[in-house]
A protein has these predicted regions:
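Catalytic cores and adjacent flexible loops of soluble metabolic enzymes
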Residues: 1-196
Length: 196
């Protein structure tokens, strides 16, 4: 099971952090930043979630959205850490993980150019970590209509990277499970789904 970890102070500009929530009736803080802080689990809460997962035989992991979160979650030593599409060109964070985190790194390629894909895989290869890298075909959107899923990208990723990385996966942002079955049939060995 995968959670998410963000450091709002690192991700938001001062102006964004201090702006009022766009829908104050749904806000958990006086500002948008305070609202985001309220929604985040602390590192101690993540440690507790990891413990509960392990007690019932589930692998715990977290998507990290910034350097602070990457360092905090790496300290918990999960089996894998996920890099969301929105952060996959945060090369300083990727380098830090290559240098300081020994587990598997799963990374989505939504919103990523082919040149960026090559740069990312090359970074992991140059650091001797490509065989710890799982890359995911992903169409960024919630929910993604079936016609926009771009499943055949799995074939392209397999052709280009299957022998260079640990695995090719599929990150589904669609409704239902039919697309997951098709992704598996096309060779995605890991299927990631979003429940919330």
């Amino acid at each position: 099971i995968k959670f998410q970890k963000r450091c709002p102070r690192e991700l938001l500009t001062e102006e964004q952090y201090n702006a009022p929530h766009p829908n104050p009736v749904n806000s958990y803080g006086a500002t948008y930043g305070a609202h985001r802080e309220f929604l985040e689990f602390t590192v101690d809460q993540h440690a507790q979630l990891k413990e509960w997962c392990e007690e019932v035989g589930i692998s715990y992991s977290t998507s990290v959205w910034d350097m602070t979160s990457a360092k905090e979650i790496a300290g918990l030593k999960p089996k894998f850490i996920k890099i969301p599409s929105a952060c996959n060109t945060h090369y300083m964070m990727l380098q830090w993980l290559c240098d300081n985190y020994e587990g598997e790194i799963q990374l989505s390629f939504g919103m990523t150019t082919r040149e960026e894909e090559q740069t990312i895989v090359k970074l992991f290869e140059e650091n001797g970590r490509a065989k710890d890298l799982v890359i995911f075909n992903c169409t960024s959107g919630y929910p993604v209509p079936f016609r926009d899923v771009c499943l055949l990208e799995i074939n392209r990723l397999r052709e280009m990277y299957e022998n260079r990385v640990k695995a090719i996966g599929f990150s589904g942002h669609h409704l239902g499970i039919a697309v997951d079955v098709a992704a598996y049939t096309l060779g995605a060995s890991i299927i990631e789904r979003h429940y919330t």
